[in-house]
Structure formats: C-alpha cells, structure tokens
Curated annotation (Swiss-Prot):
<keyword id="KW-0472">Membrane</keyword>
<dbReference type="GO" id="GO:0006099">
    <property type="term" value="P:tricarboxylic acid cycle"/>
</dbReference>
<dbReference type="GO" id="GO:0005737">
    <property type="term" value="C:cytoplasm"/>
</dbReference>
<keyword id="KW-0274">FAD</keyword>
<dbReference type="GO" id="GO:0005886">
    <property type="term" value="C:plasma membrane"/>
</dbReference>
<comment type="pathway">
    <text>Carbohydrate metabolism; tricarboxylic acid cycle; oxaloacetate from (S)-malate (quinone route): step 1/1.</text>
</comment>
<dbReference type="GO" id="GO:0008924">
    <property type="term" value="F:L-malate dehydrogenase (quinone) activity"/>
</dbReference>
<dbReference type="Pfam" id="PF06039">
    <property type="entry name" value="Mqo"/>
</dbReference>
<dbReference type="GO" id="GO:0047545">
    <property type="term" value="F:2-hydroxyglutarate dehydrogenase activity"/>
</dbReference>
<comment type="similarity">
    <text>Belongs to the MQO family.</text>
</comment>
<keyword id="KW-1003">Cell membrane</keyword>
<keyword id="KW-0560">Oxidoreductase</keyword>
<comment type="function">
    <text>Catalyzes oxidation of malate to oxaloacetate in the citric acid cycle. Donates electrons to quinones of the electron transfer chain.</text>
</comment>
<protein>
    <recommendedName>
        <fullName>Malate:quinone oxidoreductase</fullName>
        <ecNumber>1.1.5.4</ecNumber>
    </recommendedName>
</protein>
<keyword id="KW-0285">Flavoprotein</keyword>
<dbReference type="InterPro" id="IPR036188">
    <property type="entry name" value="FAD/NAD-bd_sf"/>
</dbReference>
<dbReference type="InterPro" id="IPR006231">
    <property type="entry name" value="MQO"/>
</dbReference>
Length: 450
C-alpha cells in the first residue's frame, strides 16, 4: 500500500472529516488521507459528549452581532443541508423547537431590540411573550407552588427547526461518502503525530510509532494540538493558548427544546443553556460551565493530562500579561472564580443550581446530576503581539503547503464552510480543480444566486 498522498489531514474530528469529503467530492485530487490519534473518528471535541449538539446558526446565540450571524447562518445552512440531502434525519440531524430568552426588564429590553435586527436575517424567526413561552416551554415559566415566576420574560426562536446534530455520526458519514467517491483514499487510526518534516517538495507526517505518510499538502485540523504542531515547525510563535473546558449537568427531561439565555458581552464563553440530549434519551443537559486548565484534553487524569506543549507555549511574560489584564476586570474575575467553584464536589452543585434555575425555576438540588465524562477543552487563542484574547477560529496559512486550523465553537457548525476554504486552498496550491459552483448548488444555492 502506497503511503504517498496528494493531501493528508491531521485530525479525524468533524472539521477534518468535512474537508476529507469536500476534497473527494468536489476536487480533482486523486488520493487524500486522514490520520487520527484515537481508535475511532470524532472521539474528542466532535464526540456527542463533548459539545451541546447544537447547530449554531446565530438565531438564538445572543453574543453574535447581526454581521456575524449573517455569516454563521450561511455556514450552518451548508452543514444542515448536507445532512438533509443525505437523508440523515433522526440519525444525525434532529428537529426540535429552540428559543433564546431574556429574564428581567434589562434582558427583555435587549431581546426586543435584538429581535428587530435579527428577524430580517432569519426568515420565520418568531417573537415569544411570556404566555407563548409558557405554552411552548411550561417549565421555563412555572415557579414555586405552581405559580408563574414573577420576572418579566420574552424570547424569540423557532417552534420547529433542524437545530440538533450528532457531529460524531456526521463525521463518520463524511468519511463513508469520501471513501465511496475515492476508493484510494485512506484513513489511519491510532496514528498519533509526533512531528512533521519537510522533505524537498513533500511533507512527512511521522507518528509516535515511527510510521510515516507523505503528502504534497498537509492540513492540520487537530483541535487543541494544532498550535503546538505549528510552533514545532516555527509557525505561530506569536500565539499562546488558553484552554477552556466546559462541563455539563444532567437534569430530568423538563425541556421540549433548546433554551438559551442572554450572554454577558464581556465574557467570551457561552451563557448557560438547556438542551435535550440527542443521544441519552430522557436527559436534558444544562451548561456549559467554563474552567481554564493546563490541559489540551479534558477527560484525562489530572497528572497525565497536564500538557508540556501548553507550558512551552504559555510560560512567558506576554501570556501572563494577557491573563493579568483579563483577571483585572471584576466581572471576568468573578466569572472565573464562580466556575472554579462549580467543579467542586457538593458545593459546586449547590452554586450551579442558581444559574440553572434561570432556565427552569423549579429545579431542586436532587434534580442536578454532574455529567461525568462530558464536555471538552476549547482552545482560545492568545495573541502575544496584540496582548489580547482572540475570540473564534484561528488559521495559520504558511503558503508553503501546510495550514493549521484552531476551531473552537462554532467550528463544528461551520465545518463545511471551513472545508470549502481549505479545499480551495489545497486545490489551488496543487494545481488541481475545484467545482465551486456545484458545491454551492448542492449545499448553499442562496450563495450561488448572489
């Protein structure tokens, strides 16, 4: 079996698998490979346990500006449309209601203004008053002793929307389709990359077991590990990483759909939301919390999981200055300490209950169950030159046949949009063709028309 490929993708999560499919379906590349360190695809950030299983299209994510929502909506549409085109309903993609709510006069005023801006972007977006929310999500309004909660509440959202996705199963489908299209493609599991070497006009991707695969182009979609790999080759040395891990709590099946809350604009992390679990029936997840930790993967034991690569990246004056500046803000400081408390046994559950009751007021301590093994690290990039936290996705394009992607949320939602960008770059670099018009025709006709 030849180990030489046109392109090798490092990382078998949903982003890497989407590019594997896109190159196979729409480009003239003949052989593409994925190398993945786990024994199965999509076992880390793309696992159904690691994320909220949400297609983040911007309609109920209150931290998105209208400009960002317009872009994210188109990205989300591609991922949704792929699943519907392939007939993956109720296996990979699920239909449910969803809404964002404002609680209290200040948040309600914000939600009213937001609706006026966003109803033009999202066709069919509906505004919900307190009575309508009670009809759709009775447990959001029901207070103590069977009496409605006293706060003013309004929201907006959809009564039905293809809004829930199992990104692990989507990853598997991408790979299955890609292998049908190009049987010479290859997937290498249990291949933990140790280093990447440039050898003339080819890259050698070398595993810890001394296996080697070769490619003219390497795309690194390795989540938290992308930046350490880049820095090992001399790229991205002006960047650091703030790993933020999210945890969830299970509650009984008290919500009919997704319920999101208003996010503090100062905080780069999602506000607490409720999501009926698509995999574990009869359970609803409340979360995430946000805890910084010196690990590139969440669910490893503490000592084994501490990352030497992370320490190399972050043990410098610039990173400490960024951290100091962030912690100097009272709201951010209180948020960080509060989330540290959430992780403590016994007391953490008591403290989290108050946040969870913003969504379901009647929740009791007995209703909350810490979701062990759920949640994952999202690498937030620190720009050491600008001395600030960079929100969202980060790409290092070397223009030398290797690109590094760091894709925290909404990276899974945007997987096909990111795959489009990367596939076009790879095809152009290798002098191959890419059928952009057919891509848009299949997955985003709206962009083709415009």
């Amino acid at each position: 079996m030849s180990m030489e490929f046109d392109a090798v993708i490092i990382g078998g999560g949903v982003s890497g698998c989407a590019t594997f499919y896109t190159l196979s379906e729409y480009s003239s590349l003949k052989r593409v490979a994925i190398v993945e360190k786990c024994s199965k695809l999509a076992q880390i950030s793309s696992s159904a346990k690691a994320n909220s299983q949400t297609i983040h299209d911007g309609s109920i994510e209150t931290n998105y500006t209208p400009e960002k929502a317009k872009k994210v909506r188109l990205s989300a549409y591609k991922t949704r449309q792929y699943a519907l085109n392939k007939g993956l309903q109720n296996e990979v993609i699920f239909e449910t209601q969803k809404m964002a709510i404002g609680v209290g006069d200040e948040e309600c005023e914000f939600m009213k203004k937001r609706y006026e801006s966003f109803k033009e972007i999202f066709v069919g977006l509906e505004e919900f008053d307190k009575q309508k929310i009670k009809e759709l999500e009775p447990n959001v309004i029901l207070g103590a002793n069977g009496i409605d909660r006293h706060e003013n509440i309004i929201g907006h959202g959809y009564r039905k929307d293809w809004s829930t996705m199992n990104f692990a199963k989507l990853s598997e489908n991408f790979v299955e389709e890609a292998l049908k299209l190009k049987p010479n493609n290859q997937v290498f599991l249990n291949f933990k990359v140790k280093k990447i070497e440039k050898r003339n006009d080819t890259y050698a991707v070398i595993s810890e077991d001394a296996e080697e695969v070769y490619a003219k182009f390497v795309l690194v979609n390795a989540g938290s590990y992308a930046l350490p790999l880049a820095q090992s080759m001399g790229y991205g040395l002006d960047l650091g990483c703030l790993p933020v891990a999210g945890s969830f709590y299970f509650v009984p099946d008290l919500l009919r759909g997704k319920v999101y809350t208003v996010q503090n604009p100062k905080l780069p992390f999602a506000a607490v939301h409720g999501d009926p679990d698509a995999v574990i029936k009869g359970k609803t997840r409340i979360g995430p919390t946000a805890l910084t930790m010196p690990k590139l993967e969440r669910n490893k034991c503490w000592l084994k999981g501490i990352s030497l690569e992370l320490l190399k990246m972050d043990l410098n004056r610039d990173v400490f200055k960024i951290a100091f500046d962030l912690m100097s803000d009272k709201e951010i400081r209180n948020y960080v300490f509060k989330n540290m408390v959430f992780e403590l046994p016994i007391i953490g559950k008591r403290k989290f209950l108050k946040d969870a009751q913003k969504i379901i007021p009647t929740l009791s301590l007995e209703d909350l169950e810490y979701a062990h093994g759920f949640g994952e690290v999202r690498p937030q990039v620190l720009d050491r030159t600008k001395r600030k936290l960079e929100l969202g996705e980060k790409k290092i394009c070397t223009h030398k046949g290797i690109t590094f992607n760091m894709t925290p949320s909404p990276g899974a939602t945007s997987c096909l949009q990111n795959a489009l960008v990367d596939s076009q770059e790879i095809a152009a670099y290798l002098g191959e063709s890419f059928e952009l018009e057919r891509f848009y025709k299949d997955l985003s006709p709206e962009e083709l028309e415009n």
